[in-house]
Amino acid sequence: MLQDRGFQVKTGTIVDATLIGAPSSTKNADKARDPEMHQTRKGQQWYFGMKLHIGVDSQSGLAHSAVVTSANVHDKHPLPDLLHGNERRVYGDSAYASQKALIQGKAPNALDFTNQRTRKAGCEVDEVQRAKNRNKSKIRARVEHVFAVVKRLWGFDKVRYRGLAKNATRAFVTLAMANIYLARGPLLQQVRA
C-alpha cells in the first residue's frame, strides 16, 4: 500500500533491536514459563521475553523488515534478514560493529556506518571516534521513533500470547500500523489533493 503511494525503500538501512517483555512467573496452569522466551541482561538489569529486530529505511524512517527472536539471541545474528541487498549505507549501534563481512555479503555496495567502540582496554577514550559516533547516532535515531510508536502508542511493550509465532504475527501487524502512522502526513496530503 505504501509503495503504491510513492513510499519506497531507498538506499540506506538502519538496524536495531528492542526487548519485549514476557511474564516470568510460573503461577499458571502449566506451572512453567513460556519455553520459547528467554532471559538476557542489558546493563545490570535482567529481562525475560523476546527481541524485535527491525530494519528501517534511513530516509523515510519506515520499517521494511523485521525478525522476532528470543531475548538471548545477539543482535548480530538476524542482521542478514534485515538487509534488502540494495543498500548503499548500513547504520547500527555498536552491537553490529564487527559485522563488516556479513554486511558486504548481503549488500555488496553498502558502506558500514555502524557505531564503533570508543574505549579499548587500557587506552584513552578516542574523542574523534566519539564525535563520528555522535553524527551517526543522529541518523540512527529514526529507528527509535518506530520503536516508540510500536511500544508506546500501540502498547506492544509486553507479549500477549505464549510462543514466538503468535507474538511475531502481532509484531508484524503492529509494525505495519506504525508505518502508516509515521507516514500519515504525506498520506493525508495525497488524499486531500
Where does each model-flagged region fall?
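Polybasic low-complexity intrinsically disordered regions
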Residues: 1-108, 115-117, 172-178, 193
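C-terminal extensions of enzymes
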Residues: 163-192
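Residue-level marker of positions within ordered structural domains that often coincide
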Residues: 59, 155, 181
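Generic structural signal of hydrophobic/aromatic residues within well-ordered alpha-helices
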Residues: 79, 87, 128, 150, ...
